[in-house]
UniProtKB/Swiss-Prot annotation:
GO terms for cellular component: cytoplasm. It comes from the Bacteria. The keyword Cytoplasm applies. Belongs to the GroES chaperonin family. Heptamer of 7 subunits arranged in a ring. Interacts with the chaperonin GroEL. PANTHER family: 10 KDA HEAT SHOCK PROTEIN, CO-CHAPERONIN GROES. Keywords: Chaperone, Cytoplasm. This is Co-chaperonin GroES. It is found in: Cytoplasm. One of its GO terms (biological process) is chaperone cofactor-dependent protein refolding. The lineage of its organism: Bacteria, Bacillati, Bacillota, Clostridia, Peptostreptococcales. NCBIfam families: PRK00364.2-2, PRK00364.2-4. Together with the chaperonin GroEL, plays an essential role in assisting protein folding. The GroEL-GroES system forms a nano-cage that allows encapsulation of the non-native substrate proteins and provides a physical environment optimized to promote and accelerate protein folding. GroES binds to the apical surface of the GroEL ring, thereby capping the opening of the GroEL channel.
Amino acid sequence: MNIKPFGDRVVIKKVEAEEKTASGIVLPGAAKEQPQIAEVVEVGPGGIVEGKEIKMELTVGDKVIFQKYSGTEVKIEGQEYTILRQSDVLAVIE
């Protein structure tokens, strides 16, 4: 992949949703809930947002939980990614 986000943005790749429920029911593609867990694949340099300096706290490889419906989805070389602001990330999974 060759994409470099500007400012306080990060590029994430969503983790695949579960194919089965906890009780063993297989879900068709449309019934799967969109995952809110992703892996950070690129990080912008940070910058000034609304007059405040934003330092990047995320690093490539972090597993994160992000806000639903945030960011912009893009497809590059057949892979789907989401570009969003660092502030749309709710937590890092350790």
